[in-house]
């Protein structure tokens, strides 16, 4: 008789046992395996009372600013403002570079969007130290979209480029917001490290190629070919003779200073943490602007400069043209989807990296909602899509940031710099801005190269092949195609892994012993066994099938195929082209250990019924072991128990089958 605790664990799930109408076995002889407490393979469910959160707690959970802002300590204000100043010094030059060298739009739009978006992000995020802004990958996608419109028309006005940038940010924000509301944050599992390395390698190469014309100062020549990176690379190689030597020298000096300062700060940051907050990029640009104005580099040496920067107050509006709105949206939809995906992935990477240091719990759905709000806010000012960046976040933390106020301070300082400091940058050479972008590309390429060398050292050739396939596809057909190609490979890998059966078999080997054979693994039974071997004849003709997972339409078909091969060839992985040397009649007993079958769908149920029926028709004795009560109820309802001989063939453990068959299975 089961104990009260066992009856409590069972609850209403086993009520069918008391009310069953089958006469295959008397009620008092029902086996004890139907008690969840006695099934060693089933986890006991803890009876933990759940407290429903109040309305105020729910509101504070979904809008964290209502919780942290009233509890903000003024002792942190100095550290947050200093950190915001350091991050702003990093964000302003990057925004200028993206606006001028990537998109060709006035910097006022990019800077305003870069300031407004993070403020909205702070209202919803639960990560206090994350810093967000525009990233190179999304700028690259938008630049490709603008260039495709250039190819389809004679020219694209600057107003159109501004609207394209804002609309793509709006689409990305809507998608991120909807994904967060519908709880699709689990999709970050689609991003495998291999896909990430392939995308980083591709983005780094395309960044350096796209900045080549400005970096070398090509004069009198403009690229008008296709949007494929390989064609742009060939254009650069063919026109190297037209490069401005002074522009090239200045670009090389700038990129050397930027990379040198970054490496120096990286080496000294452990000993002097505050060194990270030094705005080296701003200092280099201000120095270049001063020297350019003093020696008149534009007139004397032909070095292009940024020119006058208009600073006007922008009002929020939807980034849509007056005519052909639907066609305009259609042309931007695919790029918007890609940008939303990249924004989410970049943010998750940064948040996870920071969470390891701060022990914060990451909630992907909340980050999606925060990103959606930030990108929608940025798009209303025709700004770029923004996302979390690891470099920017690291600078924020190393500068002493304590709360989300650091991000708000950064946004306020960017707005102040936009309206009061921008005229200082009017004489900055554009090649220096391009050098900043190229230095980011070099940094990404170096990170990807380090990971690739690690994979090559451990000889993971399959993953290396995927990385270089993504990079090759991107170079040949563009970044969007490369990302789609990489995602397709990842999805196929996930599907293959999720549908791969973990079912184990046990049958006599050639030396007369019995061993478990994992369906996926190489086994000692892979060689052909001589059917006349006396060891096989003397071995017990018993097949044990352990199923450690729920049965559904995908893995049950593999179960049928593996059983068929095992019956014919002695091993479930034997090639079907071999000559069969066994028959199903050679098996006397089949034991299905349903240790992990907590559920079964209709397709798997009918397929499993066919398997049992075939064994019964060939007079093979079938036993079921460790059945879950719910699955047992389904089997009884659909006649599977009557098919195998009733409850006498259902046991709670392998030991019971040992006693019934008068053998020792040794499982």
Curated annotation (Swiss-Prot):
STAS domain: residues covered: 532-657
Classification via CDD domains? STAS_SulP_like_sulfate_transporter
A single Gene Ontology CC term: fungal-type vacuole membrane
Q: Which positions make up the signal peptide?
A: none
Q: Where in the cell is it found?
A: Endoplasmic reticulum membrane
Would the keyword ATP-binding be found if you checked this record's keyword annotation?
A: no
Q: Name one Pfam family in it.
A: STAS
Q: Quick one: where's region Disordered? A: 1-27
The UniProt GO MF terms for this protein read:
sulfate transmembrane transporter activity
Q: Which residues cross the membrane?
A: 77-97, 102-122, 162-182, 198-218, 240-260, 275-295, 301-321, 336-356, 368-388, 405-425, 433-453, 465-485
The family assignment reads: Belongs to the SLC26A/SulP transporter (TC 2.A.53) family.
In its UniProt entry, what is this protein called?
Probable sulfate permease C320.05
Q: To which species is this protein native? A: Schizosaccharomyces pombe (strain 972 / ATCC 24843)
